[in-house]
Amino acid sequence: HGGAYLIGSPATHRAITTHLARRCAAEVCAVDYRRAPEHPFPAARDDALAVYLALLEAGHSPRRLLLAGDSAGGHLALSLALELKACGLPLPAGLLLFSP
């Protein structure tokens, strides 16, 4: 979700995540990551990484996962993908970035 890593939550972005889920016939896992200034970057990325790894551990194929986000959430999705690549972890099928 957007919010400059300071504000926002999955609840504030429920309308768009619900719309995307319905239009794409997909499930959405919206991460309620830790926010700044109490938890500066990379705390949010670490939270997103933990969720991504939990999805893989639960049996979700990375080929069927898409990272998406708007504003700070777009940056978070992109930085997570770069961290996955740097760590040699399975990459998602794609990225959907709105104003990263």
Regions found by a protein language model. Name each.
Residues 1-100:
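Domain-scale detector for complete catalytic domains at protein termini or as standalone homologs
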